[in-house]
């Protein structure tokens, strides 16, 4: 049972996941530790959960989120190996570090312990994330509990670990490119006379609604695009310009560059 939840790291992504988890779990069962204690204390005050030190999280929590950057993971886990090895009860580690395999996390932790590897994205901070995950040595019951705890963060999808880096390039890196697109749409609106705030609002809501239509209709994006383009209309003229400028190829190249 994943009754107690700990976070080692309370940065942007760790904080976003902690906020989501505290909506599904009793905050009094959530423990936060961070290299800068003040950051953990501020988040704990916001959420009504507890603060402690890394060793206490490693020794007491059933589900431990490893919420540090990949280059900091070994430094985080090395001092905790003995504590983890001496635990009498079962625990699950959850890593959100890009590029670190489950096997590498287990090696750093010093044991073949249960691990869930997740690839969240920044929209998880508003409950609209797309989070891929894969597991090792995790029971079906533990996975079900984990999914319940993570549900407030957004959609979760199990993928083979061999695909999780590619998935992250689409949904993890993708928000940055969507923000660029929203900014460019707003710039175009301003060039046509719209106030900046209105142009940004219209662009962002349009992207939100368009994405919802793709997900809920089940239609191919190309079919939805065709439905907007009237013969000889203004939309198809804009589509023509984007095709001439190489939008599709540029986006595909961005995904591939991020993957490589």
What is each of the regions a protein language model found here?
Residues 30, 40, 73, 195-203, ...:
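Small-residue helix-packing motif on alpha-helices
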Residues 204-260:
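NAD(P)-dependent Rossmann-like dehydrogenase/reductase catalytic/cofactor-binding core
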Residues 104-114, 130-166, 178-216:
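Internal alpha-helical scaffold of NAD(P)-dependent oxidoreductase catalytic cores
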Residues 1-59, 128-129, 190-192:
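NAD(P)+-binding Rossmann beta1-loop-alpha1 motif at the extreme N-terminus of oxidoreductases
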Residues 115, 164-169, 221-226:
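Short pre-catalytic strand/loop immediately N-terminal to key active-site residues, enriched for Gly-Thr
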Residues 17, 37, 47, 55-130:
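Rossmann-like NAD(P)(H) cofactor-binding subdomain of soluble oxidoreductases
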């Amino acid at each position: 049972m994943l009754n107690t939840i700990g976070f080692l790291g309370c940065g942007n992504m760790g904080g976003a996941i902690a906020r989501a988890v505290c909506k599904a779990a009793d905050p009094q069962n959530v423990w936060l530790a961070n290299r800068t204690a003040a950051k953990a204390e501020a988040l704990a005050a916001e959420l009504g959960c507890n603060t402690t030190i890394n060793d206490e999280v490693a020794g007491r929590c059933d589900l431990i989120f490893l919420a540090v950057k990949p280059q900091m993971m070994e430094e985080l886990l090395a001092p905790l190996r003995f504590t983890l090895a001496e635990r009498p009860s079962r625990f699950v580690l959850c890593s959100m570090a890009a590029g670190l395999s489950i096997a590498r996390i287990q090696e750093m932790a010093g044991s073949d312990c249960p691990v869930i590897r997740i690839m969240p994205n920044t929209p998880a901070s508003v409950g609209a994330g797309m989070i891929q995950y894969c597991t090792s040595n995790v029971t079906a019951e533990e996975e079900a509990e984990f999914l319940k705890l993570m549900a407030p963060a957004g959609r979760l999808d199990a993928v083979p670990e061999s695909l999780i880096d590619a998935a992250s390039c689409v949904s993890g890196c993708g928000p940055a490119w969507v923000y660029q697109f929203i900014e460019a749409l707003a710039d175009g609106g301003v060039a046509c006379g719209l106030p900046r705030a209105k142009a940004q609002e219209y662009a962002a809501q349009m992207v939100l609604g368009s994405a919802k239509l793709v997900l809920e209709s089940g239609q191919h994006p190309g079919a939805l695009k065709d439905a907007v383009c009237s013969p000889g209309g203004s939309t198809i003229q804009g589509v023509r310009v984007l095709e001439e400028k190489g939008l599709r190829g540029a986006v595909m190249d961005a995904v591939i560059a991020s993957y490589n």
